[in-house]
Every structure is written in C-alpha cells, then in structure tokens.
Amino acid sequence: MSTQVSELFDADRWAPVAGFDGLDDITYHHDRSGRIARVAFDRPEVRNAFRPRTVDELFRALEDARTNPRIGVVILTGNGPSPKDGGWAFCSGGDQRIRGRDGYRYSDGETAEGIDAARNGRLHILEVQRLIRFMPKVVIAAVPGWAAGGGHSLHVVCDLTIASAEHGRFKQTDADVGSFDAGYGSAYFARQIGQKNAREVFFLAREYSAQRAYEMGAVNAVVPHGELEATAVEWAETILTKSPTAIRMLKYAFNAVDDGLVGQQLFAGETTRLAYGTDEAVEGRDSFLEKREPDWSPFPWQF
C-alpha cells in the first residue's frame, strides 16, 4: 500500500514510481494496472504554489509518463488539505516569495533569503504547458481547490478538467501581481469560453466558482469533493477503452487549429508515420533500396 499523500488519494489504487524517490514538491504514482499516471503538486501549506524545483520535478514526471508506452492518461492534481488551515488547492501559481526580476529563482528555503544568486531565474512552467499540450496522451486536471495564476493556466492547457463542487475555486491573478500569460493561459482560454468571459476573468481578477467555470465552458464536470479523484480515474478508464491511435490523432487535430505551423507539423508528422504502415509506402521504400522504379499500379487514386 502507498503512503497516504492526500485525503482524496486512494492508497490501494496507486503505487509510487521507481526512480522517483527523491521528489520534494510533487508526488508521482501509477495505478496498479500501470496505465494511468497521477502527478500531484505537494506543497499544500502554500496552496501548491510552484517554485523552480517544483517545475523541474513536474516536467520530469510528465516526461516519464509521456514516454511510457503503457500510460494512456495522466491525472494532474494537488495534494491536500493544507496542514495550516485545511484549505485545498490544485495549484496557486508561482510562489511570489522567490520571484525575481528575471523570473522565479532557485532557493534553498521558502523565502527570498535563500535565493541562489548564481543561478538565473526561470519561467519554465511554460515548458510544462507545452509538454502537456503536445504529449499524445490525455491529461485530466482534477481540481480539488484553488486554481489561480499559473495554476489556472495549467488547468486551461489540460485536455479535460473536473472540479470539486465544494472547494473548487478559480482566479486569474496575473494583473494583480504584474504578470501575464500571453499564450495558452489567455488566448487559448478565450477560445474555450469566449473573448468577453476571458477578458472578465483576467481584467477583474475575481474569484469564481467551479459551477461558474462549468457554465462558461472552462470545466467539463463539477462533482462532490470526495468523488473528485475517483471520477477522474473513471474517465481515464473509459478513455483507455478507446483506440490509442485515434485518441492521439484526435488530440493533435483539436490542437492544430490553435497551434499554427507547430500544430500542423505534429498532425502531419503523425499522419506520415501512419502512412508508413501502408503497402503503398512500403513499395516506395523498397523500390528506392532496390534501385528500381516504383510500381504504383496496385494503388488506386481513391476518392
């Protein structure tokens, strides 16, 4: 049985992943079937705010899930509740205590006094956004509490979002702290809920509920708090009954309209890879290797 890392965590279902024993800021588990990954922020005392170390660990776990051929779905969530006040959070964004003039700074402690002056600041949470966006697997955000600032942007970039009815809270704090997510967190968010709603969320920076997020189209489902992770697992298990190739191509197709040439390249590259499996592509390869003209006669100009 796994260690109980969160009140919503089912220790009988999940097992820690080998090679990830030294994590400080997140937890990383696979379900007993080895097909679903659970990646969770684990700084509940600061509303699961991230620092550079958090992002390093998050990227490492997500990349491991991406490259594991058995994993089909990733559940991204936040452990809790806070030992300080019992509050819940998915992720409240960057830890402002260690934000410098050049980004978020590496620190040995929890305050600015521990900042490592020899290392540049980072904003590599954007690399995590792109990893979630481009991985050919479904990423479900299970939001047990606050999704604010950079945490709000992370739920936006996930493929699906399920939120706690009792504790799910959303707020885009960028304009309050002199920051702005000018990519997926804002422009793609506007695609999801419409320009007027997105501008309201950013410009007014007000808290809004899980139900309001659902009504705007930012959340797929609002469920009782105690059922949040079980619902995410249920959705994941349903997705795992589908064709892996179809899910992969559908995700890239949905992305392509907003991702420009990068999205087109990903979709076209996957299409090319699939085409390599046809007899027609095999004939093209073999004719080249055999130094002869290809024989396309068996292949009709289909319509």
Please tell me what each predicted stretch does.
Residues 130-244, 278, 282, 286:
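Crotonase-fold acyl-CoA enzyme core
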